[in-house]
Swiss-Prot record:
Residues 427-560 form the SHD domain. The lineage of its organism: Eukaryota, Metazoa, Chordata, Craniata, Vertebrata. The modification Phosphothreonine is found at T255. It comes from Homo sapiens. Residues 568-878 form the MHD domain. Phosphorylated in vitro by PKD. Neddylated; deneddylated via its interaction with the COP9 signalosome (CSN) complex through TOR1A and COPS4. This is Stonin-2. GO terms for molecular function: clathrin adaptor activity. GO terms for cellular component: AP-2 adaptor complex; cytosol; neuron projection; nucleolus; synaptic vesicle.
Length: 905
C-alpha cells in the first residue's frame, strides 16, 4: 500500500509519481524531493492497507505488525507489473505541461514525521508516453496499471472518503510543524484502520464543512474531496491504517485551480491534525440527509478564523414560534410562510439549484436518484395538503359510520318486523281467570271473553264479541303495571300465556337484618288476570296496554306526597332494548331489523324535584355541561342517533328539541315509561348463528338445526366478560295435522314428548300411523308446546357453562307420518328465536348523566337489558324418492349428504 511516508510534492502542483521500489524506474514530472526532507516515514509510523497493494522500500524501517510478513511478496508482484524489464529510460517531460494541475493527497489521517526520501525515485523515473488525467501513471508500454498494481494515480470511486490536495507551499508548512505533531499522529494512526466501515454511516453535512472548521465532539473535521474509491476496493477492519496517497479528480482536467469546487486548505490547519472518529459508511443516502450548503464550497476559507459548525434542528422554524394551530387545517400557516420565503429568495434558489445539479453530475456514477417526485409538482402537493380537513367520524351522515346513518335503513324499516303487533285493533279474544280472587273453598278456571281498549284508557270486558254493553269496565291509572308474561296450566293439551294488571304502590321500609337498611318495596294488588293461547294476540295486547299507560295525562300533583321526606332518596333508570328482525338462512345476515328502546323511571325524591337526563345523543356530543357528581359510568364510547322519540306527559319536549336534554318532573314512587325511541342495531351479527335444514322423503320428515356462538358479537369476544343469553327459545312451527304424533298417553292423560340432553324422546305407545317420532338435543330440552303450536327447543343459558363457547349444539327430529298425504302443501318456512340478555344494549344507548335539582346525595341506578326476537329462514331440501325403493338405513346417509352440500362451517 502506498503511504504518505514517501510523498514528494512538485512545485506548483506538478505531477509526481512515487514508487518505493528502487530497482525499477517510476514516472515523475519533477525531481523536487529536496523540498521535503522531513517527510519520510518514521519507525513509529504504522502502515495500513485500504485495498491497494504498494511496494515497501527495502531499506526503510517498518515496525507495523500488520504488513511485516507479506511486504516482500507485494514488492515482487507489483514491481514486475509496474516496470517491465528492458524498458528504456526516457527524459522527464516539460514541467510547464502540468503547472495548472493540483496535487491532491487522499488522506484524512494526521501526517507523521517522515524519513529521508529515496533520491533514485525521481532520477530513474520514466516519462509519460500519453497524458491521462484519470490514470497519469502510464508505463513505457502506454498501458494503465492494473487494479492490483494500485498506483497512486488511480482514481477512487468512493464518494465518502474525503481528502485534500496540498500545494507546494502547504508542504513547507507541514515540514515546519512535523516535529511537534509527529509523535501524536503516529500513535493515533492506528485508530483509523480504514476509511470504509460497514457498520457506520457518513453524515451528509461533512461535504459542506470547511477545512478550517474546529473539531466536533473532540475530533477534527475531516477535509472534503470529490475523490472516490473504486468499487472493487475492500477493506479489512483489522488492518492498521496509514496515510493515503494523493489522488487526482477525474472530472475537469483543464479547470484551473481557482475555479475548482474543492476549497483550499488553510495554511495553519494541515499540520495540526488530531485524532478523529472513523468514517461510518461509503454509501450516502441523499434521501435521508439535509440539504447541502453548496455556496460554502465556492467560498474562500478564512485563514485567521472560521465560524464553528453547529448542528441545527431541521424541524425548528423560529419564525413560526408564535403561530397558533389552526382548527381547520394545522398545515396552512406553515405553507403560507414557506410560500412567502420562497418568493423572497427566488434568485438565490435558482443559483442553488444550478450548483446542486453540478453535484449530482459529480456523484451520479455512485448514487442513484429517485425521479418519482418529479412527476408531481410541489405546488400540487401543497394544495392537496391545504385541503385536508379533520372530519368528525360521528357527524351525521358520515361515511365512516354507515350503520349510524338512518338513510341506509329506510327501505328495511319501512315495514319493520313485528309492526303488525303494535297496530291498533278492535279487540282481542282472551281468557279471564274466574273467580278473580283466590278462594280456598272454590276452584278457579279460565272463561272466554272479548276485551276492548278505548282511547280514553278504559278496558272493557265482553262475554262475546259483538255485544254492545260490557259486563265490566275499569280505567287504567298511572300506578298500574303489567306483570311479566308467564305460562300457566290450561287444560290437558298444554299451557296458556297469562299476565296480570296490578296496582302497585311503593313504600319505604326499614330493615334491621342482617344490618340496618332502608328499602323501597312494592305492594301489588291484582286488578285483572288475562290469558290466551294465541301468542301473537298476547303480544299485541301487551303493546297496546303499554302505549295507553304512557299516554295517560299527568294530573295535578298529589299534595299528600309533596311534603313526604324519604330517609334515602334514590332514582332508578331502566333501559330496555327490544330487537326484532328477519335473518337469512345461509349466512345469518340481518335482512330487516327494528330496535325500540324504552326508558323507565322509578324515583323516591322528597318534595318537588326537577331532573335532567342525558343520553349519548350524537347531537349533544361536545356540548354536555354537567356536574362531576352527575356523570354516570358507561361501558361504551359510541354515540347514537335517536329517531321517532315519544315522551311521557311529565317531560318538557320544548327543552329537548332545543338542547337535547330530557327535563322532567318524575312521578313520586311510581314506575312509568319516560320515553321511547328507535335506533339502528349497533352490532354486525347476532349473539349466535342458527342454521336449519328440512328433509321430506315421502312420509318421513327430518329437521335438524345447528347452533353456534358468533365471534363477531361484541359480548362474545372476551370469554371472561362474556354475557350469556338467557331463556333461549327456538320454535319450530308444526302443522295441526302433526300434533298427534308428539303426544303420548300417560296415567294422568296425554303428555307431550320431551327430549333432554343425551336422552331422546321416548314413546309409551305408537301413534295412529304406527310410527314414532324421535327428537334429540345436545343441550337443553325440546318438546311440543301447545301455547306456541311449535316444537320449542329451550336452553336456559347460552353458552353453556360445561362447554366451550365455540362448540356447536344440535337439534334433530325425525317424524314418520302415516302417508305422504299428511304432508301439507305449504307450511311455515321460518324458525322463531327469542331470548334475553342482561346488562347489554342492542342499541348502545347509555345514560351519561342524571341530575337532580338542589340534591347531591341522591342514589342513582341505571339498569340495562335487551330482548331479542327474530325469524330465521328455514332451508328446505325435498327428496321426492319412491318409498319402496329407499331402504330405511340409507335415509340418514342421504340426509347427511344433503346437509354437507348445503351448509359448511
Amino acid at each position: 500500500m502506498t503511504t504518505l511516508d514517501h510523498v514528494i510534492a512538485t512545485h506548483q502542483s506538478e505531477w509526481v509519481s512515487f514508487n518505493e521500489e528502487p530497482p525499477f524506474p517510476a514516472h515523475s514530472q519533477g525531481g523536487t524531493e529536496e523540498h521535503l526532507p522531513g517527510l519520510s516515514s518514521s519507525p513509529d509510523q504504522s502502515e495500513s492497507s485500504s485495498g491497494e497493494n504498494h511496494v515497501v522500500d527495502g531499506g526503510s524501517q517498518d515496525h507495523s505488525h500488520s504488513e511485516q510478513d507479506d511486504s516482500s511478496e507485494k514488492m515482487g508482484l507489483i514491481s514486475e507489473a509496474a516496470s517491465p524489464p528492458g524498458s528504456p529510460e526516457q527524459p522527464p517531460p516539460d514541467l510547464a505541461s502540468a503547472i495548472s494541475n493540483w496535487v491532491q493527497f487522499e488522506d484524512d489521517t494526521p501526517w507523521a514525521s517522515t524519513s529521508p526520501p529515496h533520491q533514485e525515485t525521481a532520477e530513474t523515473a520514466l516519462p509519460l508516453t500519453m497524458p491521462c488525467w484519470t490514470c497519469p501513471s502510464f508505463d513505457s508500454l502506454g498501458r494503465c496499471p492494473l487494479t492490483s498494481e494500485s498506483s497512486w494515480t488511480t482514481h477512487s470511486e468512493d464518494t465518502s472518503s474525503p481528502s485534500f490536495g496540498c500545494s507546494y507551499t502547504d508542504l513547507q508548512l507541514i515540514n515546519a510543524e512535523e516535529q511537534t505533531s509527529g509523535q501524536a499522529s503516529g500513535a493515533d494512526s492506528t485508530d483509523n484502520s480504514s476509511s470504509l466501515q460497514e457498520d457506520e454511516e457518513v453524515e451528509m453535512e461533512a461535504i459542506s464543512w470547511q477545512a478550517s472548521s474546529p473539531a466536533m465532539n473532540g475530533h477534527p473535521a475531516p477535509p472534503v474531496t470529490s475523490a472516490r474509491f473504486p468499487s472493487w476496493v475492500t477493506f479489512d477492519d483489522n488492518e492498521v491504517s496509514c496515510p493515503l496517497p494523493p489522488v487526482t479528480s477525474p472530472l475537469k482536467p483543464n479547470t484551473p485551480p481557482s475555479a475548482s469546487v474543492i476549497p483550499d486548505v488553510p495554511y495553519n490547519s494541515m499540520g495540526s491534525f488530531k485524532k478523529r472518529d472513523r468514517p461510518k459508511s461509503t454509501l450516502m443516502n441523499f434521501s435521508k440527509v439535509q440539504k447541502l450548503d453548496i455556496s460554502s464550497l465556492n467560498r474562500t476559507p478564512s485563514v485567521t478564523e472560521a465560524s464553528p459548525w453547529r448542528a441545527t434542528n431541521p424541524f425548528l422554524n423560529e419564525t413560526l414560534q408564535d403561530v397558533q394551530p389552526s382548527p381547520i387545517n394545522p398545515f396552512s400557516a406553515f405553507f403560507e410562510e414557506q410560500e412567502r420565503r420562497s418568493q423572497n429568495s427566488s434568485i438565490s434558489s435558482t443559483t442553488g439549484k444550478s450548483q446542486r445539479d453540478s453535484l449530482i453530475v459529480i456523484y451520479q456514477d455512485a448514487i442513484s436518484f429517485d425521479d418519482s417526485s418529479k412527476t408531481q409538482s410541489h405546488s400540487d402537493a401543497v394544495e392537496k395538503l391545504k385541503q385536508l380537513q379533520i372530519d368528525d367520524p360521528d357527524h351525521f351522515g358520515s361515511a365512516t359510520l354507515p350503520d349510524d346513518d338512518p338513510v341506509a335503513w329506510i327501505e328495511l324499516d319501512a315495514h319493520p318486523p313485528g309492526s303488525a303487533r303494535s297496530q291498533p285493533r278492535d279487540g282481542w279474544p282472551m281468557m279471564l281467570r274466574i273467580p278473580e280472587k283466590k278462594n280456598i273453598m272454590s276452584s278457579r278456571h279460565w272463561g272466554p271473553i272479548f276485551v276492548k281498549l278505548t282511547d280514553t284508557g278504559y278496558l272493557q270486558l265482553y262475554y262475546e264479541q259483538g255485544l254492545e254493553k260490557p259486563f265490566r269496565e275499569f280505567k287504567l291509572e298511572i300506578c298500574h303495571e303489567i306483570s311479566e308474561p308467564r305460562l300457566q296450566n290450561y287444560d290437558e293439551n298444554g299451557r296458556i300465556h297469562s299476565l296480570r294488571i296490578d296496582r302497585v304502590t311503593y313504600k319505604e321500609k326499614k330493615k334491621y337484618q342482617p344490618k340496618p337498611a332502608v328499602a323501597h318495596t312494592a305492594e301489588r294488588e291484582q286488578v285483572i288476570k288475562l290469558g290466551t293461547t294465541n301468542y301473537d294476540d298476547f303480544l299485541s295486547f301487551i303493546h297496546a296496554v303499554q302505549d295507553r299507560l304512557m299516554d295517560l295525562p299527568v294530573l295535578s300533583m298529589d299534595l299528600s306526597t309533596v311534603g313526604l321526606n324519604y330517609l334515602e332518596e334514590e332514582i332508578t333508570v331502566d333501559v330496555r332494548d327490544e330487537f326484532s328482525g328477519i335473518v337469512s338462512k345461509g349466512d345469518n345476515q340481518i335482512l330487516q331489523h327494528h330496535v325500540l328502546t324504552r326508558i323507565h323511571i322509578l324515583s323516591f325524591l322528597s318534595g318537588l324535584a326537577e331532573c335532567r337526563l342525558g343520553l349519548n345523543d350524537i347531537l349533544v356530543k361536545g356540548n354536555e355541561i354537567v356536574l362531576r357528581q352527575d356523570i354516570m359510568p358507561t361501558t361504551t364510547t359510541k354515540w347514537i342517533k335517536l329517531h321517532e322519540c315519544r315522551f311521557h306527559g311529565c317531560v318538557d319536549e320544548d327543552v329537548f328539541h332545543n338542547s337535547r336534554v330530557i327535563l322532567f318532573n318524575p312521578l313520586d314512587a311510581c314506575r312509568f315509561e319516560l320515553m321511547r325511541f328507535r335506533t339502528v342495531f349497533a352490532e354486525k351479527t347476532l349473539p349466535f348463528t342458527l342454521r336449519t335444514a328440512t328433509s321430506v322423503n315421502g312420509a318421513e320428515v327430518e329437521v335438524q338445526s345447528w347452533l353456534r356462538m358468533s365471534t363477531g358479537f361484541s359480548a362474545n369476544r372476551d370469554p371472561l366478560t362474556q354475557v350469556p343469553c338467557e331463556n333461549v327459545m327456538i320454535r319450530y312451527p308444526v302443522p295441526s295435522e302433526w300434533v298427534k304424533n308428539f303426544r303420548r298417553e300417560s296415567v294422568l292423560g296425554e303428555k307431550s314428548l320431551k327430549a333432554k340432553v343425551n336422552r331422546g324422546a321416548s314413546f309409551g305407545s305408537t301413534s295412529v300411523s304406527g310410527s314414532e317420532p324421535v327428537m334429540r338435543v345436545t343441550l337443553g330440552t325440546a318438546k311440543y308446546e301447545h301455547a306456541f303450536n311449535s316444537i320449542v327447543w329451550r336452553i336456559n343459558r347460552l353458552p353453556d357453562k360445561n362447554s366451550a363457547s365455540g362448540h356447536p349444539h344440535c337439534f334433530f327430529c325425525h317424524l314418520e307420518l302415516g302417508s305422504d298425504r299428511e304432508v301439507p302443501s305449504r307450511f311455515a318456512n321460518h324458525v322463531n328465536v327469542e331470548f334475553s340478555m342482561p346488562t347489554t344494549s342492542a342499541s348502545k344507548a347509555s345514560v351519561r348523566s342524571i341530575s337532580v335539582e338542589d340534591k347531591t346525595d341522591v342514589r342513582k341506578w341505571v339498569n340495562y337489558s335487551a330482548h331479542y326476537s327474530y325469524q330465521v329462514a328455514l332451508g328446505s331440501i325435498w327428496l321426492m324418492l319412491p318409498t319402496p325403493f329407499v331402504h330405511p338405513t340409507t335415509l340418514p346417509l342421504l340426509f347427511l349428504l344433503a346437509m354437507l352440500t348445503m351448509f359448511a362451517w
